[in-house]
């Protein structure tokens, strides 16, 4: 489109600025073609005329719309150019505090110079498994993308981290490796992950140093390959290093340090093991004191040394090798102190017994004389002879330094090799991810060989980067099938050819190094001759013949030739190396094993007059000329080869790029220097990426996104059903130039600037629509208002005018009369007013004059005092000003003298350089020194600033520490007060009980007290009549006091209630914490078990040929055998096989440190588990004891009577029900039988009816007989053992209870018939006392009645004794109260009248308070009674239901109809089952296999009763308990537990399986409790169920084991739930638009476009709800406890809320008003689901509260202070960090909405600064709430359970 359409009035542009690089401005008028000047308005308020370049006529860059500013991806910007990139980075870095930004495939990381809480485990978990484009930019996102692509594409990956020194490369690489270590394995064990991370401290100590730009600068490049196995777990690593800066060993610039390891050694010199090294302060050594900055602020070198040694130990470097390393490093320091003395110009010597050299030789184990000789001489070899030549002092010093550098380089390589060996794994590497931490493009004022190599490496990397970006762009275009046009991008291959091709710079440098007399000057001339004017990228400086310029991809760089040859040759004298090789110190020769080939014999360099010593040359073996050919490889050649290998590796991998940016040179946190940032953006290739993107189609929209966003630009007739065609039609009308866009298969591609143009059209359309709507509505409203006002005005005018006329006439009449009256009245009023005012004025004047006089006095006094103060202050100010002026003058004098000294120094330097040889040697040193001096000054300033900041931070830290310490003490005091309060509550309860006892005594003596009161009243009546007025006042005071007492009592009650609630909550929290800790330990234990299994499998795989006869049981069996055995003898017997297996295990290659650590950890866990188990048992006993005490409290007599009557009514109703059921059976038989059988005249019918009638008659007769016999027995017992009638129950109640007892055992009719049949079958049975056994039946009934009566009498006796004791206590308390009252009366009679009245009032107050407390106690007692009665009613209702079910089961119509042909008999119970299952011991494995291992949960859950496997297992345990078979019980339980573990390990990812076994494990646990025989668990049992209790074994220990197993299964269930729900949550809760059309769509960047995972079908909220329904139905189907289902649902909702909120906090595109509305709607749907399932009280809704508040935060207004206050009060479930993060990320979808201002966010932070919450940003999505398993007894009778044939358990039988 034309420029005139874009450059219109109010359009915003960027113009160049020398200070800010780019400055924003706004057009004041439209641009027209041909204009030479643009009228601009700057943001600071100035107007500017911007002149266009007359040659290029280029217009300034357009600025992106505000809606695009702050995007995650720079390629999402519509206008892609340098100012847009710079502004976007600045907004994100400064305003939003976001340090990461995508630029296409590049992650741009800006160093914040501040610790940020964005690298924790929670952030790693949040990014794990996510697509890169879905989350906010982060180094973890790049690492996750690499990890995911490695697993998906089976291709190795690389992460290339580059940037300037101090930009954060090393930290970024470190966090990437930490991410891999966390997601690919457990980082808490001493395995490869820890070793990979442990290599960092070692490499930092030997390869990092302090520079002027960075305190921890890496002085080498490294490429770390992290190896993974087939399961993508870290198995090892390998490190390659590049271009170590060896010169730093011997030389450091000002304010810089040598490598950290030297200073760490010096700081640790006082350690005993380091005494032999003879080290001291770092200032004592030449190699560590040159920089003058031996200490780094905030770094403790001694502690760092300890970390380094610890890392070496972890990596397997032995103590002897560590000491060897330290010996060599100490030797290097002592070597640097070796001094030389000149004998003449060409020779030197070392003083005899020179101490530094002696120490060096002693540490290195070499001969002193030999080393002394070769440090001052060198050997020159020719073809025939060898010469030994002395060297000058300068040459000797250089040789010494070269030797030190060589030793350090060899030691560095040796350490790297050992680290690689430690990281190497025997397991075959399947794939790897490489992390390249390499120096970025460098340019300084003086650039040398190091900068040349660094920039050469960056040229190669930039070429590879350009090709990769180009390839990705091409793939995207081809994938979308759009016309492919070649993008023109910078190709730096010519620059690379200039450096590395034949006769290139490196080639000429190597050739010059081979020349005998080669120098830097000759090499420079060769460069000029070869490349000058032939290569456009090579230039020569105008004023120098010893430098050259290369045009790199980032900038032109001028290199000084001086030192190139020396650094490239890296010459070390061979004789010195031979001396070191002959060392007695074994480690030293290892460093030089490869030097025979590497070091060449030195050749003669000059033919001076130096005296030579001739020796015959030794003949060389092999071919002639071999020695001449075996030249040492130069540094440049080695670097080129290693760089080629690196590029081959990178080209074979998929690269990922991280570009680190240094925002400022002063290390100020969150300070952005635009100039420095632009330099680095140009150097690191970010702008090149932008240029490549801008050359193509950077903006890309799907058709649906485009339609949703720009629907407002379409007319109704343009909208078709085909979205693609609709978009095409609209675009052709909106953008006429078809080259500006392309239509792909799924996306529309736009050129740069087109999206901004479309946004402008959209905004204009919306703005015009808004204006039109506003215009119409305002016009209509105003016209309507005008017509209404006009009508009202006319009406009002009519009435007002008439009224005014009438009033005017009346006015005229009254005016005359009023005038006369007024005349006289005014005179009177004026006269009166005058008198009053005169009198008042006189009074006022008197007071005012006195007041003014006093004020004047005080003013004079104040002025006098002020003059004295001013005198003192002015004197002090004058003295202060004088001192400051003197200080400034002295400072100026110092500066001037320093300047003069510098000038003098400069003159001296000029004079010193007059000597020609000195000039050659030290050319260029002056400039360098001046430059370094300036840098030193700047560094000093920075250092002072940092010191001040550090002091402030230390002060803040100390204050915070004190504050936290005071808080801790306060909490401890509150805890002690809570304990004291608990004790007080107990004592108060005892006092209350005592007062209750005293109450009755007080009542009995009440009459006596009343008599005393009457007498007292008579005596006081006369006194009261005399003091009536005073009495009235006292009554008022009394009422006030009463009111106050009531109020205080109320407040006290409320306070106590609040305290009780708080203490209860605190106890619950403590219990939950303890439970969570215990369950976490269980989880850790199970994880260690799994780890042990994995290690065992690996060991098994590593053993190729197993020995015969060696067999290993499963780990789960062995672990449980050793842990859960309750029989010590059997445990000892079964431990024997495991002991015999130990020697075979030792032969397997295993990391013993890992094994011992695991063993120790397991032991600790077992001990902690035992302690926690004891605590849990103790707490449970306390709870049971308290419950028992509550139940044993004597009930009120009335409640007991009601209870007995209720039981009697229940039994009567049950009897009626039995009769009704019998009648119903008759009716059903008559209705449902076949016509021929059930007809009234049918024979079968008659027989059946006759039998039923006879049975019912017999039953009635037997009942009467039983009643008579029992009554006789009771009377006999009364005669023998007489009891008090009050303690016995009525006979009718006893008999009814006996009937009930018999009903509990079985139906009376069936019992009778069963006995009758038994008597018929065995005539000789001793039970047969008469014909049909009636007497035996009666005898059994009487025995049971006798037992029942005895138990009831004992209980009545106990209750009677308790009641008598209580009455005695009350009598005693009443007596005491009576005595106290008498004493009070006696005292009151002796008091004067006033005191007597006061005492009586006090007494009355005390009496009322006591009565109030008594009433409250009675109320509480009645409430408890009501609650207990309600509970009993529920129990009886449940029993009635069970009896009804039992009756229906025992007498069913089906039993009668089964055999219609033969005569119908009454169904009889052939056998009375005892609820046990019998099996043989050899069938145990078959039982476990069929019931657990091979059981399919789905078939069991659908067709059989819930929990059937648990019931079967328990019935088997009951039978083993019945047999008293210890071993069988133990074996069955252990096999059951191990089999469940095995099933869950095999099918642990299947929700149905885990849910099924969780339900059955809990049911099994409940059965063990229900039938344990313990009173606390037997309350809800029937008498029949109580008969099924275990008799021989106490399985409490196994209950704990099963509880632990249930906890582990629950945690596994939660993990399965999380794995299933996690892919759905983000898509369903955040991304899917549940409310269509609410949220707009914004343009996306390259990351969002090129996700590593293709869309697999989006999930919606309905998907989540369907999945929740599925989970709920499965759990209900499996019969899971309702309380457990609630806990599972609560955990599910917590996972949904946590993951949704975490993604919201990490995704800027989700933080908008419309998205808040979507989230709130989705949450309401989840709440509706909870209501439908009756789970609102499960606590699940509360877990969504943080998400709800985050959604509300997105929707509320965010401008004023009131809004800030509302936000702070509303968001109490969010932490301060989360609130601030949401506000920072808030992004308007439309440009009409304003962003959240920085001032508003600061206001929020100020208001929340006192809030004490977690600083953690993300919620812990892995958190699992502690689970509890409330006891849930089963009403199912064990004897009724049938074993289905489908289970294949025919080998077990019911007993």
UniProtKB/Swiss-Prot annotation:
Annotated stretches, region: Actin-binding: 643-665
Phosphothreonine modification, residue list: 1032, 1760
GO CC terms, sorted: actin cytoskeleton; cytoplasm; cytosol; extracellular exosome; filopodium tip; growth cone; insulin-responsive compartment; melanosome
Residue numbers bearing the Phosphoserine modification: 600, 1452, 1652
Domain Myosin motor, residue spans: 69-763
Domain of life: Eukaryota
Annotated GO biological process: actin filament organization; actin filament-based movement; cellular response to insulin stimulus; melanosome transport; post-Golgi vesicle-mediated transport; protein localization to plasma membrane; protein transport; vesicle transport along actin filament
Recorded coiled-coil stretches: 914-1237, 1338-1445
Region annotation Disordered: where it falls in the sequence: 598-631
Residues given in the record as ATP binding sites: 163-170
Gene3D superfamilies in the record: 1.10.10.820, 1.20.5.190, 1.20.58.530, 3.30.70.1590, Kinesin motor domain (3.40.850.10), Myosin VI head, motor domain, U50 subdomain (1.20.120.720)
CDD domains: IQCD (cd23767), Myo5a_CBD (cd15478), MYSc_Myo5 (cd01380)
Biased composition, class Polar residues, residue ranges: 600-613
Catalysed conversion reaction: ATP + H2O = ADP + phosphate + H(+)
Keywords, comma-separated and alphabetical: Acetylation, Actin-binding, ATP-binding, Calmodulin-binding, Coiled coil, Motor protein, Myosin, Nucleotide-binding, Phosphoprotein, Protein transport, Repeat, Transport
Tissue and organ expression note: Detected in melanocytes.
Domain Myosin N-terminal SH3-like: 8-60
Residues found modified as N-acetylalanine: 2
Keyword check for Transmembrane helix: no
Domain Dilute as annotated: residue spans: 1534-1810
Disease (UniProt): Griscelli syndrome 1: Rare autosomal recessive disorder that results in pigmentary dilution of the skin and hair, the presence of large clumps of pigment in hair shafts, silvery-gray hair and accumulation of melanosomes in melanocytes. GS1 patients show developmental delay, hypotonia and intellectual disability, without apparent immune abnormalities.
Known role: Processive actin-based motor that can move in large steps approximating the 36-nm pseudo-repeat of the actin filament. Can hydrolyze ATP in the presence of actin, which is essential for its function as a motor protein. Involved in melanosome transport. Also mediates the transport of vesicles to the plasma membrane. May also be required for some polarization process involved in dendrite formation.
PANTHER family reported for this sequence: MYOSIN, UNCONVENTIONAL MYOSIN-VA
Family assignment from sequence similarity: Belongs to the TRAFAC class myosin-kinesin ATPase superfamily. Myosin family.
Protein name per the record: Unconventional myosin-Va
The organism of origin for this protein: Homo sapiens (Human)
């Amino acid at each position: 489109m034309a420029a005139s359409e874009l450059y219109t009035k109010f359009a915003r542009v960027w113009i160049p600025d020398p200070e800010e690089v780019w400055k924003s401005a706004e057009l004041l008028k439209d641009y027209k073609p041909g204009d030479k000047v643009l009228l601009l308005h700057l943001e600071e308020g100035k107007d500017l005329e911007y002149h266009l370049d007359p040659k290029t006529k280029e217009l300034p860059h357009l600025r992106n719309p505000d809606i695009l500013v702050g995007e995650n991806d720079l390629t999402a910007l519509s206008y892609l150019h340098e100012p847009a990139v710079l502004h976007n980075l600045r907004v994100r870095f400064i305003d939003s505090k976001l340090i990461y930004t995508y630029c296409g495939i590049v992650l741009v990381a800006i160093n914040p110079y501040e610790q940020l809480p964005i690298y924790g485990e929670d952030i790693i978990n949040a990014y794990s498994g996510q697509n890169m484009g879905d989350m906010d930019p982060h180094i973890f996102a790049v690492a996750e993308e690499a990890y995911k692509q490695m697993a998906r594409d089976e291709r190795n990956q690389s992460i290339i981290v580059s940037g300037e020194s101090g930009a954060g490369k090393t930290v970024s690489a470190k966090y990437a490796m930490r991410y891999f270590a966390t997601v690919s394995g457990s980082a808490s064990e001493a395995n490869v992950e820890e070793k990979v991370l442990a290599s960092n401290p070692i490499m930092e100590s030997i390869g990092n140093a302090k520079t002027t730009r960075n305190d921890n600068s890496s002085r080498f490049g490294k490429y770390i390959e992290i190896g993974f196995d087939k399961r993508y777990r870290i198995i090892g690593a390998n490190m390659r290093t590049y271009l170590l800066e060896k010169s730093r060993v011997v030389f450091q610039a000002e304010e810089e340090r040598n490598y950290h390891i030297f200073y760490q050694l010096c700081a640790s010199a006082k350690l005993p093991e380091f005494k032999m090294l003879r080290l001291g302060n770092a200032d004592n050594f030449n190699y560590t004191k040159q920089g003058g900055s031996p200490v780094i602020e905030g770094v403790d070198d001694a502690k760092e040394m300890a970390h380094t040694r610890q890392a070496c130990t972890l990596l397997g470097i032995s103590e002897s090798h560590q000491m060897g390393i330290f010996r060599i490093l100490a030797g290097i320091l002592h070597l640097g102190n070796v001094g030389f003395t000149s004998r003449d110009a060409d020779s030197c010597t070392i003083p005899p017994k020179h101490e530094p050299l002696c120490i060096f030789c002693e540490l290195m184990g070499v001969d002193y004389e030999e080393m002394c000789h070769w440090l001052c001489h060198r050997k020159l070899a020719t073809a025939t002879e060898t010469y030994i030549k002395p060297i000058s002092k300068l040459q000797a010093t250089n040789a010494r330094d070269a030797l030190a550098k060589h030793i350090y380089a060899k030691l560095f390589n040796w350490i790297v090799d050992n680290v690689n060996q430690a990281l190497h794994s025997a397991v075959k590497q399947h794939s790897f991810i490489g992390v390249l931490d390499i120096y970025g493009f460098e340019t300084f004022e003086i650039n040398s060989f190091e900068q040349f190599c660094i920039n050469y490496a960056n040229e190669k990397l930039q070429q590879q980067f350009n090709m990769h970006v180009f390839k990705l762009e091409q793939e995207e275009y081809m994938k979308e099938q759009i016309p492919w046009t070649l993008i023109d991008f910078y190709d730096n291959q010519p620059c690379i050819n200039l450096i590395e091709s034949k006769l290139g710079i490196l080639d000429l440098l190597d050739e010059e190094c081979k020349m005998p007399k080669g120098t830097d000057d000759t090499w420079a001339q060769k460069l000029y001759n070869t490349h000058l004017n032939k290569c456009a990228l090579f230039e020569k400086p105008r004023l120098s013949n010893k430098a050259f310029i290369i045009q790199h991809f980032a900038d032109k760089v001028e290199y000084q030739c001086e030192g190139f040859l020396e650094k490239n040759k890296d010459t070390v004298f061979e004789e010195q190396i031979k001396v070191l090789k002959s060392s007695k110190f074994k480690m030293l020769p290892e460093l030089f094993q490869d030097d025979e080939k590497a070091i060449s014999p030195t050749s003669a360099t000059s033919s001076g007059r130096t005296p030579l010593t001739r020796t015959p040359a030794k003949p060389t073996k092999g071919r002639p000329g071999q020695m001449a050919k075996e030249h040492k490889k130069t540094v440049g050649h080695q670097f080129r080869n290693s760089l080629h290998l690196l590029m081959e590796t990178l080209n074979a991998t998929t690269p990922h790029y991280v570009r680190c940016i240094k925002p400022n040179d002063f290390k100020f946190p969150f300070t952005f220097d635009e100039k420095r940032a632009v330099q680095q953006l140009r150097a690191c290739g970010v702008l090149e990426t932008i240029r490549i993107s801008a050359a193509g189609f950077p903006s890309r929209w799907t058709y649906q996104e485009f339609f949703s966003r720009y629907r407002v630009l379409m007319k109704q007739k343009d909208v078709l059903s085909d979205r693609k065609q609709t978009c095409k039609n609209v675009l052709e009308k909106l953008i006429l130039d078809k080259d500006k866009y392309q239509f792909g298969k799924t996306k529309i591609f736009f050129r740069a600037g087109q999206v901004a143009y479309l946004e402008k059209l959209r905004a204009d359309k919306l703005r015009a629509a808004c204006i039109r709507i506003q215009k119409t509505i305002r016009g209509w409203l105003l016209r309507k208002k005008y017509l209404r006002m006009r009508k009202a005005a006319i009406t009002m005018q009519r009435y007002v005018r008439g009224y005014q006329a009438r009033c005017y006439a009346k006015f005229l009449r009254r005016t005359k009369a009023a005038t006369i009256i007024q005349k006289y009245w005014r005179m009177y009023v004026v006269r009166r007013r005058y008198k009053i005012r005169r009198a008042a004025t006189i009074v006022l004047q008197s007071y005012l004059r006195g007041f003014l006089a006093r004020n004047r006095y005080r003013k004079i006094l104040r002025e006098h005092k002020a003059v004295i103060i001013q005198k003192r202050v002015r004197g002090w100010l004058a003295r202060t000003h004088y001192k400051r002026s003197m200080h400034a003058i002295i400072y100026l004098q110092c500066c001037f003298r320093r300047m003069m000294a510098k000038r003098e120094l400069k003159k001296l330097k000029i004079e010193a350089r007059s000597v020609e040889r000195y000039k050659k040697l030290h050319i260029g040193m002056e400039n360098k020194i001046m430059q370094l001096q300036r840098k030193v000054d700047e560094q000093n300033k920075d250092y002072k600033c940092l010191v001040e900041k550090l002091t402030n931070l230390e002060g803040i830290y100390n204050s915070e520490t004190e504050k936290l310490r005071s808080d801790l003490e306060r909490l401890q005091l509150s805890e002690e007060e809570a304990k004291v309060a608990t004790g007080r509550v107990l004592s108060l309860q005892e006092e209350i009980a005592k007062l209750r006892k005293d109450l009755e005594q007080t009542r009995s003596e009440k009459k006596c007290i009343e008599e005393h009161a009457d007498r007292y009243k008579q005596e006081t009546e006369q006194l009261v009549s005399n003091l009536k007025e005073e009495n009235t006042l006292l009554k008022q005071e009394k009422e006030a006091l009463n009111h106050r007492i009531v109020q205080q009592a109320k407040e006290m009650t409320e306070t106590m209630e609040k305290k009780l609630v708080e203490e209860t909550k605190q106890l619950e929290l403590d219990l939950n914490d303890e439970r969570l800790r215990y369950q976490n330990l269980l989880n850790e234990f199970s994880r260690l078990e799994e780890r042990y299994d994995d290690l065992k499998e690996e060991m098994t795989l590593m053993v190729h040929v197993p020995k015969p006869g060696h067999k290993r049981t499963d780990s789960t069996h062995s672990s449980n055998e050793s842990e859960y055995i309750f029989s010590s003898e059997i445990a000892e017997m079964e431990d024997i096989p495991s002991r015999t297996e130990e020697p075979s295990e030792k032969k397997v290659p295993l990391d013993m440190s890992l094994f011992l650590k695991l063993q120790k950890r397991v032991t600790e866990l077992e001990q902690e588990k035992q302690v926690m188990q004891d605590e849990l048992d103790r707490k449970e006993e306390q709870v049971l004891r308290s419950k028992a005490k509550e139940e044993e409290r004597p009930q009120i007599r009335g409640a007991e009577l009601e209870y007995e009557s209720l039981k009697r009514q229940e039994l009567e109703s049950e009897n009626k029900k039995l009769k009704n059921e019998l009648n119903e059976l008759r009716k059903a038989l008559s209705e449902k039988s076949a016509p021929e059988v059930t007809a009234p005249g049918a024979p079968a019918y008659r027989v059946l009816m006759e039998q039923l009638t006879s049975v019912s008659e017999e039953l009635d007769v037997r009942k009467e007989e039983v009643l008579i016999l029992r009554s006789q027995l009771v009377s006999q017992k009364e005669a023998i053992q007489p009891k008090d009638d009050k303690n016995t129950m009525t006979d009718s109640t006893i008999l009814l209870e006996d009937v009930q007892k018999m009903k509990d055992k079985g139906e009376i009719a069936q019992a009778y018939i069963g006995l009758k049949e038994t008597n018929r079958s065995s005539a000789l049975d001793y039970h047969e006392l008469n014909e049909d056994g009636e007497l035996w039946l009666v005898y059994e009934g009487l025995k049971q009645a006798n037992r029942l009566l005895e138990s009831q009498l004992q209980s009545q006796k106990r209750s009677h004794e308790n009641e008598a004791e209580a009455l005695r206590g009350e009598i005693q308390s009443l007596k005491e109260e009576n005595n106290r009252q008498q004493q009070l009366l006696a005292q009151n009679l002796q008091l004067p009248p006033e005191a007597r009245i006061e005492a009586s009032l006090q007494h009355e107050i005390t009496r009322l308070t006591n009565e109030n407390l008594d009433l409250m106690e009675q109320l509480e007692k009645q409430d408890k009674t009501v609650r207990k009665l309600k509970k009993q009613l529920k129990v009886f209702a449940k029993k009635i239901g069970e009896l009804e079910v039992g009756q229906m089961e025992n007498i069913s119509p089906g039993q009668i109809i089964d055999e219609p042909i033969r005569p119908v008999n009454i169904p009889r119970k052939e056998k009375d089952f005892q609820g046990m299952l019998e099996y043989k011991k050899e069938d145990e494995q078959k039982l476990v296999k069929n019931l657990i291992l091979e059981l399919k949960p789905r078939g069991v859950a659908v067709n059989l009763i819930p929990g059937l496997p648990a019931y079967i297992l328990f019935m088997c345990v009951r039978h083993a308990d019945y047999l008293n078979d210890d071993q069988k019980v133990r074996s069955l339980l252990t096999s059951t537990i191990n089999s469940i573990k095995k099933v869950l390990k095999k099918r642990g990812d299947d929700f149905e399986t885990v849910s099924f076994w969780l339900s059955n494990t809990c049911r099994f646990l409940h059965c063990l409790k229900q039938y344990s025989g313990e009173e606390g668990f037997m309350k809800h049992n029937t008498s029949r169920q109580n008969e099924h209790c275990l008799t021989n074994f106490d399985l409490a220990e196994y209950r704990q084991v099963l509880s632990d197993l249930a906890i582990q299964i629950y945690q596994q269930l939660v993990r399965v739930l999380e794995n299933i729900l996690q892919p759905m949550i983000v898509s369903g809760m955040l991304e899917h638009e549940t409310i269509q059309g609410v949220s707009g769509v914004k343009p996306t960047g390259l990351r969002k476009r090129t996700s590593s995972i293709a869309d697999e079908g989006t999930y919606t909220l309905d998907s989540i709800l369907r999945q929740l329904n599925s989970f709920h139905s499965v759990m209900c189907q499996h019969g899971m406890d309702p309380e457990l289902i609630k806990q599972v649902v609560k955990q599910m909702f917590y996972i949904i809320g946590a993951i949704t909120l975490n993604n919201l906090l990490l995704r800027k595109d989700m933080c908008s008003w419309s998205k808040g509305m979507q989230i709130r709607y989705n949450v309401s749907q989840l709440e509706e689901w909870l209501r439908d399932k009756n789970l609102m009280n499960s606590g699940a809704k509360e877990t969504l509260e943080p998400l709800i508040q985050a959604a509300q935060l997105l929707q509320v207004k965010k401008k004023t202070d009131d809004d800030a206050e509302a936000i702070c009060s509303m968001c109490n479930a969010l932490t301060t960090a989360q609130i601030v993060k949401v506000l920072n990320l808030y992004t308007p979808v439309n440009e009409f909405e304003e962003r959240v201002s920085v001032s508003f966010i600061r206001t929020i932070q100020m208001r929340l600064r006192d809030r004490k919450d977690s600083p953690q940003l993300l919620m812990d999505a892995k958190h699992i709430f502690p689970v509890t398993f409330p006891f849930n007894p089963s009403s199912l009778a064990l004897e009724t359970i049938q074993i289905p044939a489908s289970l294949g358990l025919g080998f077990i039988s019911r007993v």
